[in-house]
Regions:
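A small/polar active-site loop signature that marks catalytic segments
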Residues: 1-10
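Structured C-terminal helix/loop/strand segments within mature extracytoplasmic catalytic/sensor domains
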Residues: 12-109
Length: 109
């Protein structure tokens, strides 16, 4: 699976209808809100607060170096870089997302 495909899969958490690209409704607004809140507060293990502060989006990291981040009602972005930091999150992935949300002024805060 490519990271383009991964970001497309997670778009249901970013679009305002909480549905697939084919229009199949997956979640209620309440469910999507809860999932995004959990991702914002828990998606990066012990570094979740730092990710929220630096990037400002709900997200989830994987030990393979992947990160998925969601801007509700706007977009979903996936990045990958295998070098992990001390908290087992992608070092360059987090750095890229921080720069991206700063330059585009697209943090949720």
């Amino acid at each position: 699976m490519s990271y383009k495909e991964l970001s497309e899969i997670f778009m249901f958490l970013a679009n305002d209808e909480f549905s697939t690209s084919k229009g199949n409704k997956i979640l209620s607004m309440s469910q999507a809100k809860r999932i995004n809140a959990i991702m914002l507060t828990c998606g990066f293990y012990d570094e979740s607060g730092e990710f929220a502060f630096r990037v400002g989006l709900p997200g989830k990291s994987g030990v393979g170096g992947g990160i998925i981040a969601i801007h509700p009602d706007k977009y979903c972005i996936a990045v990958w870089s295998p070098k992990l930091n001390e908290q087992s999150n992608s070092y360059k992935g987090m750095l890229f997302l921080e720069k991206f949300t700063t330059r585009t002024a697209s943090s949720i805060f």
